[in-house]
């Protein structure tokens, strides 16, 4: 079993590996900087607007999830609309991803079907290369 943080950006539901989530913030409390950066604790980190990243209609997001895209990578702030909570899932609960364009498939590897609410949640790959999110690559990344 593994624990995932279920989030929403626009109409898309995502699952983030909870072991790599550092913090969840309201964007009202975040000091935004220039060039897609924000202050977090005593550091300046990159931000990624997931709506923009996935080609969804651009809008004001309300939540930020501080997340490490790879085990040894610097955290980034994923900007999204809603945090739905933690889900404890067995590997057998994940379904193979349907055929989708490779531009989208590089972000996701499995899908969880929530039949009770007629919802699909896409599991964000981990590790995920920073350059896929428009972030600079670093030497210790895979």
Model-derived regions: residue spans:
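An acidic, low-aromatic, low-complexity terminal/linker signal
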Residues: 1-142
């Amino acid at each position: 079993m593994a624990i995932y943080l279920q989030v929403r950006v626009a109409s898309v539901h995502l699952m983030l590996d909870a072991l790599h989530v550092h913090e969840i913030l309201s964007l009202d409390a975040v000091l935004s900087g220039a060039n897609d950066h924000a202050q977090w604790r005593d550091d300046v980190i990159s931000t990624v607007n997931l709506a923009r990243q996935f080609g969804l209609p651009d809008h004001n997001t309300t939540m930020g999830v501080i997340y490490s895209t790879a085990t040894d990578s610097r955290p980034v702030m994923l900007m999204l609309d809603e945090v739905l909570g933690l889900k404890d899932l067995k590997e057998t609960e994940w379904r193979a991803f349907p055929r989708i364009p490779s531009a989208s498939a590089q972000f996701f590897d499995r899908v969880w079907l929530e039949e009770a609410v007629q919802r699909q949640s896409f599991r964000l790959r981990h590790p995920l290369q920073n350059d896929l999110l428009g972030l600079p690559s670093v030497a210790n990344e895979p």
